[in-house]
Curated annotation (Swiss-Prot):
It comes from the Eukaryota. InterPro entries: Prot_inh_I20 (IPR003465), Protease_inhibitor_I20 (IPR051391). Keywords: Disulfide bond, Protease inhibitor, Repeat, Serine protease inhibitor, Signal. Belongs to the protease inhibitor I20 (potato type II proteinase inhibitor) family. Pfam families: Prot_inhib_II. The record marks R35, E36 as: Reactive bond for trypsin. Sequence repeats lie at residues 30-86, 87-146. This is Proteinase inhibitor type-2 K. Inhibitor of trypsin and chymotrypsin. Residues 1-25 form the signal peptide.
Amino acid sequence: MDVHKEVNFVAYLLIVLGLLVLVSAMDVDAKACIRECGNLGFGICPRSEGSPENPICTNCCAGYKGCNYYSANGAFICEGQSDPKKPKACPLNCDPHIAYSKCPRSEGKSLIYPTGCTTCCTGYKGCYYFGKNGKFVCEGESDEPKANMYPAM
């Protein structure tokens, strides 16, 4: 009878330890954001754009800081000089040497309008959010979900 109790205790202990290991291995975002709607006017998320076959129309002055701009043959032209938080007054001409850009964030929309219930807390990192008056409010604080996080079944 004592052996049976010891086996049950060891089995129970192994199950509890297994659950603890499983829970600690989970990637849980503990950030709790409040649901507050309608305070942001729009968001800008600098994204990679264009290709050698489908060039973009921009110049180094108007290109976003943090994004690199390349020619059709892949030669580096410049890093963008315009900060989305404080845009520079730049000429609107297209630099014929620039074909495409590579930005740290490359998926999703560049312009988010309307923002719905997005807040600074729920907004994506690397995206800049502005009030309805066009003034910079904040940079997003949440990680952007992966493209195929929940594949269709």
